[in-house]
Structures are given as structure tokens and as C-alpha cells.
Amino acid sequence: MAEPFIFVGTHRLQEGKIAEFEESFADLVRVVEENEPRMIAFNGYANEEGTEVAVVQVHPDTDSMQHHMQVVRQHITDAYASLLEETTSIQVFGHLSEAAREMMQQLAGSGVPLIVKPVPVGGFTRSDAG
């Protein structure tokens, strides 16, 4: 297996929206699980205060990430309108095609750090670690 493509997006929530975010994210998880069979992992995490969340995605390649963005486009738009205050950082690990780089820069927006580490230095991926 080639090195995976890993995406970590960190977002500040609108005040008092953690419970609504959890409900919305549960719906998103169902959509991703049903419509993205190539996705290796898709998980969300919140800080203890419930003011910031991070979404961690592991894809087999950038094509999978681009497909993901098409699948969840409307959900992302809705989340920004009603739940997210702002994106605070985007981290990408793995090869990033030019089209994917443009997509990430658009997603990051102006002033949001887009951190890209494209050069693998080693590791492994277990697909059946259960």
C-alpha cells in the first residue's frame, strides 16, 4: 500500500454549539461511511472546553480526498453557516496534487495556516488492526 493521504482540519466552534456539532457530525459520519468506501478513517475530536474541534481523515490517496469534498460539500457549507466560527488550521500529510492543493487553499481561506508535509519518511498502515 502506498502512503496514505492524511488531512487534519481544526475549527473554532460558535459559542455553545458543541452539542449541535456532535449531532451534525454524527450525521456526517453516516454520510461518509455510506458513500465513501475508500476512506480509511474519519474521526472528530473536541477540546475539553467544547470550543474547538478537529476532524482527522485518512485517505488512500488525494483522489479519495477530492471525492470526499464532493460528497460533503453541502454539509460543510451548512456547518460554517450555523456551527463553525472559523477554521484555525489545516494540516496535510502526503502527496498533494495541484488540484488538491488549490482545493485545500480554498478551504483554508485567507490567513489560515495550510501546513503541508508531502515527503514520507517511513511508517506503515494497518487496514485490519481490530
Regions found by a protein language model. Give the residues of each.
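Conserved acyl-CoA
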Residues: 80
